[in-house]
Regions:
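Extended, low-polarity transmembrane helix blocks
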Residues: 1-105, 112-192
Length: 192
């Protein structure tokens, strides 16, 4: 006779009990997942939306992180030099692999509702790193002397997405229309 120990990763008080709320948590989780997965697919295959040249074409063609790290980083931000220095010179660079795997992992994990703790925290860290690189609070003085500033110097889509990811993790959103229940019953608690 074997005993099964149930190890819920979400406390009963944190679970969503409303069926409508469960469905909407799943919809938001899947939509956020598709946002990450689309970014991966467009950068990997050069689908012609945000990325013209595919990463998979090899040397000299697509470099998914170089453009953002060289030109998208706010030059007035306190960490501009750090982020500019991370830009890989080759498509095979470590930062490209790390970034692309993070996008793929976030997209697949969120869409399927797998490993929500790791997926949500990892995705939030990725988004907050991009927020730091963009430094929306730092105004940019252009060559002609005009000042360019973001619409909101503190809260932008990176903050909203990060907060939403943490909320989805806390309410166990992977359990609804996802494989979260199965995942939780087959993996150690720290992997939930």
């Amino acid at each position: 006779m074997s005993a099964t120990i149930e190890r819920p990763s979400v406390d009963a008080a944190e679970q969503i009990t409303s069926t409508s709320a469960q469905k909407w948590a799943a919809v938001v989780r899947i939509l956020l997942g598709f946002t990450f997965l689309w970014a991966f697919l467009d950068k990997a295959f050069g689908l012609g939306y945000a990325t013209e040249k595919a990463w998979l074409f090899g040397a000299g063609e697509g470099n998914p992180t170089a453009g953002f790290l060289k030109f998208g980083v706010n030059p007035e931000g306190p960490m501009a030099g750090f982020f500019n220095g991370l830009a890989p010179s080759s498509p095979a660079g470590f930062m490209n692999w790390l970034f692309m795997l993070a996008l793929l992992g976030a997209g697949v994990g969120l869409i399927l509702g797998l490993a929500m703790r790791i997926t949500s925290i990892g995705s939030a860290i990725l988004l907050m790193s991009m927020w730091l690189a963009l430094a929306p609070w730092a105004k940019i003085t252009l060559e002609d002397g005009t000042i360019e500033a973001s619409n909101n110097p503190v809260v932008d889509d990176h903050i909203i997405y990060s907060a939403t990811l943490i909320l989805l993790m806390l309410v166990g959103a992977g359990r609804y229309w996802g494989l979260g229940r199965w995942w939780e019953s087959h993996t150690p608690t720290w992997l939930h």
